[in-house]
């Protein structure tokens, strides 16, 4: 990708549950896509970082809460033996809106010096104030990557089974799009219990695009939290199984399963 400035995405969040009763919803959203290494080197005047603004990004909303989230990321990668992700790191995340933030999931796309995707860190938050990360080593765009589910997110989903992640970043002419899909399989061989995705078209973050985002979604953070609880009520009415919150995992980072080897033609 050639752009080194902060981007903003306008798109949709989708969620579908297959059983015991079908349940699905979709709603419009916006998000940030931030080139973290470039921002460290040169900043971006359009991005309010670590300061008050109607739309802002704060490092301490990520990782272990330190002032430099990129430093945390590099240390996390190194602890898992990944020392060659020295290229750009694109962070797909929700901003603070009017001082409030809730980020169900953020994605750190970590590239090698040659631009190849080296790792992805999926940073998950639940409504109980807990956070956990899934680290996918050597994933490939468009190819499923998996990790065991070890972290409680919803009282209507068990902490077992695995996540299957698929990531896409495509450019067609001037259009730059991103897609992140997560399917949750609670039982081996069964269809996915949950299918979720967030997708959008990216454009430069400017004062005009930020105003448009705030005009279209003036209370996005509150809306995200309200929708989570509204959908939980719908599942309770439909008598979806209820699971109590377990203790969080001992380790803050869960490594994903090894990616399948790349097949080469004979």
Where are these predicted regions, by residue range?
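Mature, function-bearing regions of proteins
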Residues: 1-266
């Amino acid at each position: 990708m050639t752009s080194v400035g902060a981007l903003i995405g306008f798109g949709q969040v989708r969620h579908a549950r297959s059983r015991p009763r079908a349940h699905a919803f979709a709603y419009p959203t916006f998000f940030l896509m931030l080139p973290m290494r470039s921002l460290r080197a040169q900043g971006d005047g359009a991005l309010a970082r670590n300061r008050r603004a109607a739309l802002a990004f704060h490092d301490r909303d990520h990782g272990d809460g330190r002032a430099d989230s990129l430093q945390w990321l590099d240390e996390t990668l190194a602890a898992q033996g990944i020392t060659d992700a020295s290229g750009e790191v694109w962070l797909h995340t929700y901003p603070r809106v009017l001082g409030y933030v809730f980020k169900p999931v953020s994605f750190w796309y970590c590239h090698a010096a040659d631009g190849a995707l080296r790792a992805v860190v999926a940073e998950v938050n639940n409504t109980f104030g807990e956070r956990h990360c899934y680290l996918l080593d050597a994933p490939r765009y468009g190819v499923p990557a998996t990790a065991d589910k070890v972290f409680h997110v919803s009282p209507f989903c068990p902490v077992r089974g695995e996540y299957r992640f698929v990531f896409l970043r495509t450019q067609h002419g001037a259009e730059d799009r991103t897609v992140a899909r997560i399917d949750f399989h609670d039982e081996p061989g069964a269809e996915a219990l949950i299918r979720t995705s967030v997708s959008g078209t990216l454009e430069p973050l400017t004062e005009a695009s930020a105003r448009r985002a705030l005009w279209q979604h003036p209370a996005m953070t509150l809306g995200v939290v309200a929708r989570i609880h509204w959908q939980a009520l719908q599942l309770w009415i439909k008598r979806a199984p209820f699971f109590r919150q377990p203790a969080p995992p001992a380790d803050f980072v869960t490594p994903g399963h090894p990616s399948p080897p790349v097949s080469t033609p004979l």
